[in-house]
């Protein structure tokens, strides 16, 4: 009799929403199958972020990321990670109107195994969110510091420092929740308003640079593992000196080759 392996339990939106006020959601970025496979058993959510334009392609911002780029990397991540809830960023310009957004979101669903798409913007995106969810697309919202607006904002600026900003952030969160977003990313928001939003809305919040009171946290993997060291935001905690460790290994390899120590007899065919 053949032995059948137990089916892999895929994390769903229902699983994540059930964690609110119960258990913190663990999220991280990934852009390829190798790291997605490594992260798979350890996280609830993997975001294929347009941040890859900076950390993977060494660009100054996320704006030149394309739909094709996001599809390519999402396919790779889905090939490596089988259990996490996988979110794909909708890149700049890919959801400028309902027709464009629907076309690109449906492409993500048809061409990859992504669980959801993420878009940036507040209450002005509520109608678009409703349109997408009516077509069966799970939408993750993103408010606060929005990297796709970096040129308009004149840089990466923390939000929620005054009463006007705090009021807008709360209005945005409530509007997006009503429109149907399943999760809400809070980026670069002062801790008190992030806490208020998390308490006021029923869907989980995932924070990045928004304090510890969010329902979950996300970091860019190359930041937290010490690979992307040209600039380190205040909110990043390095858990590994990855760049240094890899460079030391390559130096050792190069030294072994130069000295004739690699390959040795056990590493050679006869």
Swiss-Prot record:
Subcellular location: Cytoplasm
InterPro entries xref list: Pantoate_hydroxy_MeTrfase (IPR003700), Pyrv/PenolPyrv_kinase-like_dom (IPR015813), Pyrv_kinase-like_dom_sf (IPR040442)
Pathway note: Cofactor biosynthesis; (R)-pantothenate biosynthesis; (R)-pantoate from 3-methyl-2-oxobutanoate: step 1/2
Residues where Mg(2+) binds: 50, 89, 120
Keyword Magnesium: yes
Any one GO biological process: pantothenate biosynthetic process
Residues annotated for 3-methyl-2-oxobutanoate binding in this entry: 50-51, 89, 118
SUPFAM superfamilies: Phosphoenolpyruvate/pyruvate domain
Pfam families: Pantoate_transf (PF02548)
Cofactor(s) this protein requires: Mg(2+)
Main location: cytoplasm
Manner of cofactor binding, per the entry note: Binds 1 Mg(2+) ion per subunit.
Cellular component GO terms, alphabetical: cytoplasm
Catalytic activity: 3-methyl-2-oxobutanoate + (6R)-5,10-methylene-5,6,7,8-tetrahydrofolate + H2O = 2-dehydropantoate + (6S)-5,6,7,8-tetrahydrofolate
Catalytic residues identified in the record: 187
Transferase listed as a keyword: yes
Keywords carried by this UniProt record: Cytoplasm, Magnesium, Metal-binding, Pantothenate biosynthesis, Transferase
An example molecular function term from Gene Ontology annotations: magnesium ion binding
Domain of life: Bacteria
EC number per UniProt: 2.1.2.11
PANTHER family linked to this entry: 3-METHYL-2-OXOBUTANOATE HYDROXYMETHYLTRANSFERASE (PTHR20881:SF0)
Function: Catalyzes the reversible reaction in which hydroxymethyl group from 5,10-methylenetetrahydrofolate is transferred onto alpha-ketoisovalerate to form ketopantoate.
Quaternary state and interactors: Homodecamer; pentamer of dimers.
Family: Belongs to the PanB family.
Name recorded for this polypeptide: 3-methyl-2-oxobutanoate hydroxymethyltransferase
Taxonomic lineage from the root: Bacteria, Pseudomonadati, Campylobacterota, Epsilonproteobacteria, Campylobacterales
């Amino acid at each position: 009799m053949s032995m059948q392996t137990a089916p892999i339990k895929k994390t769903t939106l229902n699983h994540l929403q059930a964690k609110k006020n119960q258990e913190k959601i663990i999220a991280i970025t990934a852009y390829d199958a190798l790291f997605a496979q490594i992260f798979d058993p350890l996280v609830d959510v993997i975001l294929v972020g347009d941040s890859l334009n900076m950390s993977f392609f060494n660009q100054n911002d996320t704006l030149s990321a394309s739909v094709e780029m996001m599809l390519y990397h999402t396919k790779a991540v889905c090939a490596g990670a089988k259990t996490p809830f996988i979110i794909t960023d909708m890149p700049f310009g890919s959801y400028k109107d309902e027709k464009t957004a629907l076309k690109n979101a449906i492409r993500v669903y048809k061409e990859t195994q992504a669980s959801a798409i993420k878009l940036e913007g507040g209450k002005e995106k509520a109608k678009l969110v409703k349109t997408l969810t009516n077509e069966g697309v799970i939408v993750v919202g993103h408010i606060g510091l929005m990297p796709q607006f970096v040129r308009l904002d004149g840089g990466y600026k923390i939000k929620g420092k005054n009463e006007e900003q705090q009021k807008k952030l709360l209005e945005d969160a409530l509007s997006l929740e009503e429109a149907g977003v399943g999760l809400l990313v809070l980026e670069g928001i002062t801790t008190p308003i992030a806490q208020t939003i998390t308490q006021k809305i029923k869907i989980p919040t995932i924070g990045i640079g928004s304090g510890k009171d969010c329902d979950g946290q996300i970091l860019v993997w190359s930041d937290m593992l010490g690979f992307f060291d040209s600039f380190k935001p205040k909110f990043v905690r390095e858990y590994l000196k990855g760049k240094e460790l890899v460079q030391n290994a390559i130096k050792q390899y190069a030294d072994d080759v130069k000295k004739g120590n690699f390959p040795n007899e056990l590493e050679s065919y006869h």
